[in-house]
């Protein structure tokens, strides 16, 4: 069993996948939004044997939902209908900022950061979810 994390944006979708033990999230790629995006996601779902999707849910800092949240809810419904997998909406506040900070600390160039930021945001979203389920299940051995 693996879980896929998605950072759904206006122009791109960042993709991350968990390891088989559900401990860590790895960035896979950034998909350009297009009519073929679902085909590309389907291929990755099959290749990585994914059985659950975690979709970043864009809340405002005060917890309210903005216009992007509605688009994300609609995309979640499309994913459920298209792939027949459970889709969890996961609070993505600060995921992009965290990804940017990590890339800056790693001294990644501006051009390279732009290429990988959505994939890294998907990693932050998925890792947050993985940490949550591990803690919820009492498997946090820190």
From Swiss-Prot:
Pfam families reported for this sequence: RuvX
Compartmental location: Cytoplasm
Biological processes annotated in GO: rRNA 5'-end processing
SUPFAM superfamilies: Ribonuclease H-like
Keywords in alphabetical order: Cytoplasm, Hydrolase, Nuclease, Ribosome biogenesis
Keyword Cytoplasm part of the UniProt annotation: yes
Alphabetized GO MF terms: nuclease activity
A GO CC term attached to the entry: cytosol
Name of the top EC class for this enzyme: hydrolase
Keyword Repressor: no
Transmembrane stretches, start-end: none
Gene3D superfamilies documented for this protein: YqgF/RNase H-like domain
Signal peptide: none
UniProt EC number: 3.1.-.-
Family named by the database record: Belongs to the YqgF nuclease family.
Function of the molecule: Could be a nuclease involved in processing of the 5'-end of pre-16S rRNA.
Xref: HAMAP family: Nuclease_YqgF
Protein's UniProt name: Putative pre-16S rRNA nuclease
Species annotation: Desulfitobacterium hafniense (strain Y51)
């Amino acid at each position: 069993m693996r879980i896929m994390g998605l950072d759904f944006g206006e122009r791109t979708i960042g993709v991350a996948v968990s390891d088989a033990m559900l401990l860590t999230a790895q960035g896979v790629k950034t998909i350009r939004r297009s009519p073929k995006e679902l085909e590309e996601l389907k291929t990755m779902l099959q290749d990585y044997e994914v059985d659950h999707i975690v979709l970043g849910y864009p809340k405002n800092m005060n917890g309210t939902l903005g216009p992007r949240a509605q688009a994300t809810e609609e995309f979640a419904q499309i994913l459920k209908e298209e792939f027949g997998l459970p889709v969890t909406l996961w609070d993505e506040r600060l995921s992009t900022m965290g990804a940017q900070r990590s890339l800056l600390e790693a001294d990644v160039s501006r051009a390279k950061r732009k290429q990988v930021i959505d994939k890294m945001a998907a990693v932050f979203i998925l890792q947050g979810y993985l940490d949550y389920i591990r803690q919820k299940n009492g498997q946090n051995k820190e």
